[in-house]
């Protein structure tokens, strides 16, 4: 893998550049995206030269000639060709996209430039303005003016970010923990800690973003984080266990399992094509070049608009006469006027449609789907409904943890997306277990024998776990990972997460070996010094009330816990959950990156309880 020869700092730059070109975020760069990049960059080059450069980039980067450039291919070639004319032109294009504002970086290296998309800023500002327009706690910064830099100052106190996180994943942050009045630099810092650690807990990749970056309104970091939060909210219901009507998208000869494997982006594309097919119109392959003429959008709007066939829902007729408009921009504007009648004009301008901005068009379609899916759950199909299971809390915690570390591709379905072990290898690297990437088969896999390639990866992943990581993997074989055996996959993931957590403590404690007893001892010493009660271990029944966790937070940061908000006696499950929500949010607020959920405390789940105390111990040790 390219990682072996490239410094961490350069790797981060390459990752940022890749993300800028891979605008639909699907983990690879297509020719469409290269064309869009050079068109938007507006470089002073004749058209034939741009075409030659794109061909050269495709030829040299697409190492296996499958029409897709993966991050590994991208990193290797950009690194190897650093001084070539093609690579220089490519980098220039990345930095000069029209509608992309370049901002001098703050690192010591001269010449560091970061950029952000003006179109994205406008889209996100309008979305946040609408989402929070009635929230009394945000009136001091809303509405923001999309034509200015309002957004970058508005996020500076953390309140807007906390609110947006709660809109995307309700109940992530306990409102009682957000500092809202008479803000000081210290209480602002707490809000930003709370926002960042909560974003991490819902699966945002925030490893390189600090509270200071948000306070100072670093544009590319603010937009990057906000997009992740918005996208998680938009995609929340594009998932079969939460929306069984999606089964209408099953094609002939497909099983339910085939549909479950699709990512939210793939499901959205299939949904769009389902409605286009119903309308007797040509299908689309993407939300960039194929939607530029707005015709597909017109037909989808016409299909999903209410027709007065459901009781109590008034019809909203769509005027599609604008589809005959000769000018692309005018046609797009007419189409958006019709979308506005459905209350679905968000995220794109007519220009964004005509330019085929993949990220904003994806958001536009996701929002349309959420409001008007226009799908009916099939009545007579022979479907095993019991096989549609939503993910458990434990599975969601592991998935969010992995995604917060920036694994690529993003994990949407725990077992399906680990079947080739690529994500597991990345997690091994995060816990300092060396991976020989020459032994790893990388996608795209051949049509014939693809599962054998994935199985070889899984066998190597288990071998690494046993020999290098010294994990207890008795009875676990590569086949179990490849086939998505729940119990055995979770056993490996737990050991990865545990080692990751303990490594943080060992790094803070000069490499001293940390075991469960070390954490319990530290917790009890800290509680005793603060005059508070102790615990017997991670199964202690008192943890169900969350009081030991709250007491520890108050011992680490004296005076931080408002005990008047808590219930300590006659505890019902509801009161316990209320305490636990407050405890988890307070842990994040004082700077602990906690992934566990409130229910884990109420039910005293020892594994997740251990991670809560370990993260608090890491936060406590940082005071020294």
From Swiss-Prot:
Coiled-coil spans in chain: none
Keyword entries, A-Z: Actin-binding, Calcium, Cell junction, Cell membrane, Cell projection, Cytoplasm, Cytoskeleton, Membrane, Metal-binding, Repeat
Binding-site list for Ca(2+) 2: 62, 64, 66, 68, 73
SUPFAM superfamilies documented for this protein: Calponin-homology domain, CH-domain, EF-hand
Locations listed in the record: Cytoplasm, Cytoskeleton; Cell junction; Cell projection; Cell projection, Ruffle membrane
Annotated positions binding Ca(2+) 1: 22, 24, 26, 28, 33
InterPro entries: Actinin_actin-bd_CS, CH_dom, CH_dom_sf, EF-hand-dom_pair, EF_Hand_1_Ca_BS, EF_hand_dom, Fimbrin/Plastin
Cross-referenced PROSITE patterns: ACTININ_1, ACTININ_2, CH, EF_HAND_1, EF_HAND_2
Domain EF-hand: 9-44, 49-84
CC terms in the record's Gene Ontology section: actin filament; actin filament bundle; anchoring junction; cytoplasm; ruffle membrane
Membrane topology type: Peripheral membrane protein
GO biological process: actin filament bundle assembly; actin filament network formation
Domain of life where this protein originates: Eukaryota
Stretches the record annotates as Actin-binding 1: 118-373
Any one Pfam family match given in the protein's UniProt record, by short name: EF-hand_7
Domain annotation Calponin-homology (CH): ranges: 118-234, 262-373, 392-501, 513-621
Tissues expressed in: Expressed by macrophages (at protein level).
Role summary: Actin-binding protein. Plays a role in the activation of T-cells.
Subunit structure: Monomer.
Protein name: Plastin-2
Organism: Danio rerio (Zebrafish)
Species classification: Eukaryota, Metazoa, Chordata, Craniata, Vertebrata
């Amino acid at each position: 893998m390219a990682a072996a020869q490239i410094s961490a700092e350069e790797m981060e730059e390459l990752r940022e550049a890749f993300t800028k070109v891979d605008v639909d975020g699907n983990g690879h760069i297509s020719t469409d995206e290269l064309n869009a990049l050079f068109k938007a960059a507006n470089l002073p080059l004749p058209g034939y030269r741009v075409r030659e450069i794109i061909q050269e980039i495709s030829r040299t980067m697409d190492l296996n000639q499958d029409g897709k450039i993966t991050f590994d291919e991208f990193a290797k070639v950009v690194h190897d060709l650093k001084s070539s004319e093609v690579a220089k032109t490519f980098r220039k294009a990345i930095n000069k996209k029209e509608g992309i504002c370049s901002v001098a970086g703050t690192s010591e290296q001269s010449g560091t430039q970061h950029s952000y998309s003006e179109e994205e800023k406008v889209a996100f500002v309008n979305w946040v303005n609408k989402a929070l327009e009635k929230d009394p706690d945000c009136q001091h910064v809303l509405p923001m003016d999309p034509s200015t830099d309002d957004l970058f100052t508005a996020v500076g106190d953390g309140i807007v970010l906390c609110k947006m996180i709660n809109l995307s994943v309700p109940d992530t942050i306990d409102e009682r923990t957000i500092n809202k009045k008479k803000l000081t630099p210290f209480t602002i810092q707490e809000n930003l800690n709370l926002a960042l650690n909560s974003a991490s807990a819902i699966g945002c990749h925030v490893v390189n973003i600090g509270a200071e970056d948000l306070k100072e309104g670093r544009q590319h970091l603010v937009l990057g984080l906000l997009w992740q939060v918005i996208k998680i909210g938009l995609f929340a219901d594009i998932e079969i266990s939460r929306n069984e009507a999606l089964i209408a998208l099953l094609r002939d000869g497909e099983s339910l399992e085939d549909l479950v494997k699709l990512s939210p982006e793939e499901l959205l594309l299939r949904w769009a094509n389902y409605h286009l097919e119903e309308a007797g119109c040509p299908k689309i392959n993407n939300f960039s070049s194929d939607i530029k003429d707005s015709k597909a959008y017109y037909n989808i709007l016409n299909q999903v608009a209410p027709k007065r066939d459901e009781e109590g829902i008034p019809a909203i007729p769509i005027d599609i006469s604008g589809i005959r408009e000769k000018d692309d921009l005018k046609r797009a504007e007419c189409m958006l006027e019709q979308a506005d009648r459905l209350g679905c004009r968000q995220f794109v301008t007519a220009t964004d449609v005509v330019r085929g901005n993949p990220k904003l068009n994806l958001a536009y379609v996701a929002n349309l789907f959420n409001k008007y899916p226009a799908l009916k759950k099939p009545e007579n199909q022979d479907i095993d409904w019991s096989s549609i299971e939503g993910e458990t809390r434990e599975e969601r915690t592991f998935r969010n943890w992995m995604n917060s570390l920036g694994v690529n591709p993003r994990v949407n379905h725990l077992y399906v997306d680990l079947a080739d072990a690529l994500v597991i290898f990345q997690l091994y690297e995060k816990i300092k277990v060396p991976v020989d990437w020459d032994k790893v088969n990388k996608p795209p896999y051949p049509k014939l024998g693809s599962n054998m390639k994935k199985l070889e990866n899984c066998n190597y992943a288990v071998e690494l776990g046993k020999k290098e990581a010294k994990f207890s993997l008795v009875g676990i074989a590569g086949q179990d990972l490849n086939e998505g055996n729940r119990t055995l996959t979770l056993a490996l993931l737990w050991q990865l997460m545990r080692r990751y957590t303990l490594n943080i403590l060992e790094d803070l404690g000069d490499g001293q070996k940390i075991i469960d007893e070390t954490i319990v001892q530290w917790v009890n010493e800290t509680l005793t010094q603060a005059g508070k009660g102790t615990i017997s271990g991670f199964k202690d029944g008192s943890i169900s009330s969350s009081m030991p966790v709250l007491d520890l937070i108050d011992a680490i940061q004296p005076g931080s816990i408002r005990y008047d908000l808590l219930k300590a006696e006659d505890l019902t499950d509801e009161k316990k959950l209320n305490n636990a929500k407050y405890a988890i949010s307070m842990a994040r607020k004082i700077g602990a990156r906690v992934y566990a959920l409130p229910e884990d405390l109420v039910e005293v789940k020892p594994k997740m309880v251990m991670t809560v105390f370990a993260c608090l111990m890491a936060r406590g040790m940082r005071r020294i």
